[in-house]
Amino acid sequence: MKINNQYQEAEAIYPVTGLYIDPEGSAVEKSEMLLSEHRMDVYINDVLTMKLVCTPKDLPGLVLGRMVSEGMIHSSEEVEYLYICEHGTRARVQLGSEHCGLVNDNLSAEVMDTPTCCTDNKTIYSGFAVEKELQHLEPVKVSLELMYAFDEAFHQDMPLHEATWSTHSCFLAYKGKIVYSCEDIGRHNALDKAIGYALMHDYDFHECAVFTTGRLPIDMITKVIRAGIPLVSSKKTPTAEAVKLAQEYGLTMIGRAKNHKMMQYTLYQR
């Protein structure tokens, strides 16, 4: 896989001035830093496939991670090249010959929305999503050392969140060590960036674990299972349906993980 990233990352935060009113009714003009929204169209084999709204950081990982979590690819060997233009508004992905027959003539029938939390992400053409069925994971045991490392990394805060309080973070561990962290306006995007980083570095997904600052509903759990990552942790709580899905597919799920405390929702009998 070749990656040609022409985009020089732009500022993700901008100053905005407004009128601050305190509880006593006093008003004063005040400036603060706000997060920007970046839009990018993703073309796969020359077909407009996704429209992403994101924080303009780590764009190659976002594109590749989204392709993994949507079931389009599962290894870097399936991707011939990824190109991102100098403005970061257009990405082009060329897949290998095994994917070339997936484009059909009725693109309008393939329009669908994707889970986005607080962004306007859309999947325009879903014909490249070849991995329809989720695969059962090989369960893993929880490493308290890693869970505490996630907790400590989270409490050190991330630059954009510290400046704006507007981002979600995701941390990726490989073989028990944290190797990557990222931020995005959407929790789904942050997770996809971590998945994409693992793909770009040819990590065995089964030896990875992720920590997210976002909630864990079914759509987030589906992404983790589809990537083949056997452990997910969050400072938030999951939904009841997400716990059932994680249990069914052998995903170890940790929630309410902060201050060296946590709740293990699945596979805790092991």
Predicted regions and their residues:
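Intrinsically disordered, low-complexity regions enriched in acidic/Ser/Thr/Pro/Gln residues
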Residues: K2-K175, Y180-S181
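Short alpha-helix boundary/capping segments
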Residues: C54, C182-G186, P238
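Alpha-helix initiation and capping sites
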Residues: T164, I185-H188
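Short beta-strand-to-turn element immediately C-terminal to the catalytic PLP-Schiff-base lysine
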Residues: A173, Y265-L267
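Histidine- and/or cysteine-centered catalytic micro-motif in compact active-site loops
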Residues: K175, E183-I185, R215
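Feature captures the catalytic cores and cofactor-binding loops of soluble hydro-lyases/lyases
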Residues: R187-Q264
